[in-house]
């Protein structure tokens, strides 16, 4: 193990990275709160500013993937599709099998200039997660309780509000509704069999309401649906903790573009289209498991320096006063002050670990274990 690889495994460095992310996030959230005064004056200016503020926070996580762990991402698609990236509004459909699938999506958003304006249909619980949920609130992210009777009006209103968004946005949908686990897959396939739908090997049964509603509400705004099927070489199952420890992964993403006009207007037909899409995604995963790669041309978009420069800027601003403060605490010789500081460090470490826990599969929601048995 080289010196750099050794340093990446050290708890103290993890604490410093976490400190920069949390404190910069709180600063960004405060500035976002102040920008609310702009909404009545210029809604579009408010949106543009918040896209850049969100970028300053999200890009720190992307930096960990691209520069800290040096994880590589390869696209399997065609040249015509690549040329449209970042130049149109799009709905993204991504499989939800991995703890860092969102991070791989974000790194592609960053490389094509839409990270700050990226959107997602997110579960309501995430709204209350510090930094993440707060930042999303100011970005007009659409939240749902995953109970369609209660969500319908909220989701429709949130989607329609995005129809005049001033920056190109990629709107992410996890159509499976929850992250893949063996238990959820078994329950999901029982439902598929009961409904006469083809059994999926690598995905859960897609929940169609969110997709058909998004397509309906964003028609005229969104130009296409990008179907993204993600997997990792070497049968790896990466985690955010692994990224933090500097582990390098190799992500492969098969991207297919479907013009929105090719998706049926009728809700039932659109739902059937989505089910067919997931059968195709399942077939793509089977090909990957057999051949170790997806079909199509390979593209490796170059990582950009902005994520690293953004993090280094925040680190320079925040760590200098932190080091001065720590030196002052220990120089004081006060046992009470030192113990108080160490207690704060422990609490901060616990808080950062809880944030990471949001991404972990074993700590994910139980949604899907029984929900598939209910009528969608």
Swiss-Prot record:
GO molecular-function terms, A-Z: 1-acylglycerol-3-phosphate O-acyltransferase activity
Membrane-protein topology: Multi-pass membrane protein
Residue ranges annotated as motif HXXXXD motif: 96-101
Subcellular location: Endoplasmic reticulum membrane; Nucleus envelope
Keyword Transferase: yes
Sequence ranges on the Cytoplasmic membrane side: 1-124, 340-376
Keyword ATP-binding annotated: no
Function in brief: Converts 1-acyl-sn-glycerol-3-phosphate (lysophosphatidic acid or LPA) into 1,2-diacyl-sn-glycerol-3-phosphate (phosphatidic acid or PA) by incorporating an acyl moiety at the sn-2 position of the glycerol backbone. Acts on LPA containing saturated or unsaturated fatty acids C16:0-C20:4 at the sn-1 position using C18:1, C20:4 or C18:2-CoA as the acyl donor. Also acts on lysophosphatidylcholine, lysophosphatidylinositol and lysophosphatidylserine using C18:1 or C20:4-CoA. Has a preference for arachidonoyl-CoA as a donor.
Protein name: 1-acyl-sn-glycerol-3-phosphate acyltransferase gamma
């Amino acid at each position: 193990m080289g010196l750099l690889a050794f340093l990446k495994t050290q708890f103290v460095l993890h604490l410093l990275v976490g400190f920069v992310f949390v404190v910069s996030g709180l600063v960004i959230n405060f500035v976002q709160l102040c920008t609310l005064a702009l909404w009545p004056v210029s809604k579009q200016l408010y949106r543009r500013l918040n896209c850049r503020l969100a970028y300053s926070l999200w890009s720190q996580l992307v930096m960990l993937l691209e520069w800290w762990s040096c994880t590589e991402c390869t696209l399997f698609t065609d040249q015509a599709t690549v040329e449209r990236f970042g130049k149109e509004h799009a709905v993204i459909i991504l499989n939800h099998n991995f703890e860092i699938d969102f991070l791989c999506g974000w790194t592609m958003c960053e490389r094509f200039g839409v990270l700050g304006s990226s959107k997602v249909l997110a579960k309501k619980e995430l709204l209350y997660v510090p930094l993440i949920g707060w930042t999303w609130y100011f970005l007009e992210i659409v939240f749902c309780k995953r109970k369609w009777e209660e969500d319908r009006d909220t989701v429709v209103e949130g989607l329609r509000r995005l129809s005049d968004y001033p920056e190109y946005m990629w709107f992410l949908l996890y159509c499976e509704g929850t992250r893949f686990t063996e238990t959820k897959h078994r329950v999901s396939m029982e439902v598929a069999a009961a409904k006469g739908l083809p059994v999926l090997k690598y995905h859960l049964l897609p929940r169609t309401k969110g997709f058909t509603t998004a397509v309906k509400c964003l028609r005229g705004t969104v130009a296409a649906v990008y179907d993204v099927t993600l997997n990792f070489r070497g049968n790896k199952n990466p985690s955010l903790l692994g990224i933090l420890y500097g582990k390098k992964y190799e992500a492969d993403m098969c991207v297919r573009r479907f013009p929105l006009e090719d998706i049926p207007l009728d809700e039932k037909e659109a739902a059937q289209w989505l089910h067919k899409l997931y059968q195709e995604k399942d077939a793509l995963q089977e090909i990957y498991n057999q051949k170790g790669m997806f079909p199509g041309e390979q593209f490796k978009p170059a990582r950009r320096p902005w994520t690293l420069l953004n993090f280094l800027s925040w680190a320079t601003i925040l760590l200098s006063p932190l080091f001065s403060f720590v030196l002052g605490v220990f120089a004081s010789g006060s046992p009470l002050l030192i113990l108080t500081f160490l207690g704060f460090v422990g609490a901060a470490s616990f808080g950062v670990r809880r944030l990471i826990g949001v991404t972990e599969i074993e700590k994910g929601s139980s949604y899907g274990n029984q929900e598939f048995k209910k009528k969608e």
